[in-house]
Regions:
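Glycan-recognition and processing domains
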Residues: 368-413, 417-429, 497-511
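Catalytic phosphate/nucleotide-handling subdomain of diverse soluble enzymes
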Residues: 45, 52, 56-64, 185, ...
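A structural-propensity feature for long, helix-poor, extended segments
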Residues: 70-90, 334-361
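Bacterial Sec-dependent N-terminal signal peptides
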Residues: 1-22
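Beta-strand-rich ligand-recognition modules
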Residues: 422-498
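Accessory "access/gating" subregions that flank catalytic or transport cores
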Residues: 23, 129, 138-147, 158-166, ...
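Extracytoplasmic mature domains of secreted/periplasmic and thylakoid-lumen proteins
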Residues: 99-151, 161
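Active-site-surrounding "flap" and adjacent substrate/cofactor-binding loops of secreted or lumenal enzymes
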Residues: 48-79, 85-88, 104-119
Length: 511
């Protein structure tokens, strides 16, 4: 009986230990610092390459600058580069003001009303919020053609860094904030990388981190399948990241959502850019320099991707183990507030640490004098959702005309997106064009198109829900302004099936 009691006690103790992870407060601080510093280093390094190499790797002979003083110089002279950071910090500042249970509306309004320029899903979400559409509707693909873009992926870091060792806690944050501007695969990018950050606190195995984090993503999603492929291709080509890049390009590089990426080499889709982050992590194998360079040389969003990779690796290594070469000039940049915020790196090192302590306690962990006890739980998949289900881009109609009074076009399909340009960079003029949109002779919507760059509407109009068949769209400008033009660029047409065969309008070479 005595032996049985001892055995049972040992099993209970083992079970409790298996469900927690203890790390020192010193290590926790060091890892949080490493995560924020890593992001900053990565985005600064990749900045000159951002969207200069689309659909191609960056040439081997292409030099990328890095020198002492470069971090401070870039932060002061090109503050808009750091959208990865200032978007994160917007949400961090809300948590700091209102606590970890800050309402979603506070996060949505804080970023929508901020003074910084935004693009893609972030800007579309901002426009929706400023015009009365709150999350999660603001990020849904039928209200936001950029729903699958990279946006929440590049700003999810805070969710992981305040949830050390707790991937499901990070997912809880992402489920709320990620839907402000994204949906489907765009949302999954932030869930996945947020989970990777959390696991970097409790594991030094990059292979484990990227595989275990994937358990937060539904298996039937395109995002899961792509990242799973990257992990498999890494095993198949363990020493040649370019082979894996080619496999990604061949299988996953067709963007069907983002209007700027459909029928174009440009790709800001979260799935492909997450693949590049994972390529950097897997082939970097814990080497900071290799990781940021490979993630950058994959191209496309070549500043955000090394930022994510370096942030995750910086968390795993901790600040002190980031090589000195990559911290050249970092100290002199750590007290500079990121533009549009009141927060510097030194500030967020401490704020992030305090938020992590509070989040550990909120999820049943413990904080002692010199350590934290983190509750461990297996990552759980978030709910399945899919953007652009049942619609396929089949044609781009070039327009390239100023909308003077009205313009109309006809097409056969079930949906369309009209791209237009009406805002001027840095404009703060309150004027907004007013356009009535008619579909098949009936008013579909009346849109306001600000010329103010910060509050602009990314696309003029879109509709993915028409019955399959012939349609006509008519655009009527109600208030022309001699100081501004509303430039119609093109219309992307969607059908209920992809165009796979030659017809009376297009030739299609089948595989």
């Amino acid at each position: 009986m005595k032996k049985l009691f001892i055995l049972c006690a040992a099993l209970v103790a083992f079970g409790l230990n298996a469900q927690t992870k203890t790390i020192s407060k010193t290590e926790l601080r060091n890892k949080i610092k490493g995560g924020w510093a890593g992001q900053t280093i990565g985005v600064t390094f990749g900045g000159p390459m951002e969207f200069r190499y689309n659909g191609t790797m960056i040439n081997r002979y292409q030099p990328i600058p890095w020198f002492d003083g470069y971090l401070k110089k870039t932060m002061l002279e090109n503050p808009g580069l750091y959208d990865d950071l200032y978007m994160d910090l917007t949400f961090v500042e809300v948590f700091e003001r209102e606590g970890l249970k800050a309402p979603l509306a506070s996060h949505a309004k804080a970023y929508a009303q901020a003074g910084y320029a935004l693009w893609h899903a972030n800007q579309a979400g901002r426009y929706n919020i400023l015009n009365g559409m709150m999350p999660p509707a603001s990020g849904h693909w039928k209200n936001n053609p950029h729903a699958d873009c990279i946006d929440y992926q590049i700003e999810c870091d805070f969710a992981g860094l305040m949830s050390p060792g707790m991937p499901n806690a990070a997912s809880e944050i992402s489920e709320q904030i990620g839907h402000i501007m994204n949906y489907g695969d765009g949302y999954y990018g932030g869930v996945y990388l947020g989970a990777a950050y959390t696991l970097a606190f409790v594991s030094n195995d990059i292979n484990y981190i990227v595989s275990e984090a994937l358990k937060t993503i539904p298996k039937q999603s395109k995002y899961y399948q792509c990242i799973s492929d990257v992990i498999r291709w890494h095993k198949q080509y363990p020493t040649d990241w370019r082979q894996t890049w080619l496999q990604v390009q061949n299988k996953w590089a067709d963007d069907i959502g983002c209007p700027d990426g459909v029928f174009a080499p440009f790709n800001i889709d979260a799935t492909v850019n997450s693949a590049y982050v994972v390529i950097g992590l897997l082939y970097g194998q814990g080497d900071f320099g290799k990781t940021v360079e490979i993630a950058t040389r994959c191209g496309q969003d070549a500043d955000c991707n090394p930022s994510s990779a370096a942030g995750i690796l910086g968390t795993m290594l901790g600040y002190d183990r980031i090589p000195a070469y990559w911290k050249l000039g970092l100290k002199e940049a750590e007290d500079i507030d990121f533009k549009y915020t009141s927060t510097s790196l030194n500030d967020v090192y401490e704020i992030g640490y305090q938020h992590a302590l509070k989040n550990i306690l909120a999820h049943g962990g413990q904080v002692t004098a010199d350590a934290v006890v983190i509750p461990s739980a297996a990552p759980k998949a978030v709910a399945f959702e899919e953007s652009f289900a049942g619609v396929y881009p089949t044609e781009k109609i070039g327009i390239n005309k100023d909308l003077m009074n009205e313009y109309r076009f006809a097409f056969e399909g079930k949906g369309f997106v009209v791209r237009a340009d009406m805002a001027k960079w840095a404009s703060t003029d309150p004027h907004a064009f007013e356009v009535d949109v008619y579909v098949d002779g009936k008013v579909f919507e009346q849109v306001k198109l600000p010329v103010n760059f910060t509050t602009r509407r990314h696309e003029l109009t879109w509709n993915y829900d028409l019955p399959m068949g012939p349609h006509e769209v008519r655009l009527v400008l109600k208030n022309p302004n001699p100081n501004y033009t509303c430039k119609l660029m093109d219309a992307i047409i969607y059908r209920d099936q992809p165009l796979l065969k030659t017809n009376d309008k297009f030739y299609r070479l089948t595989d």
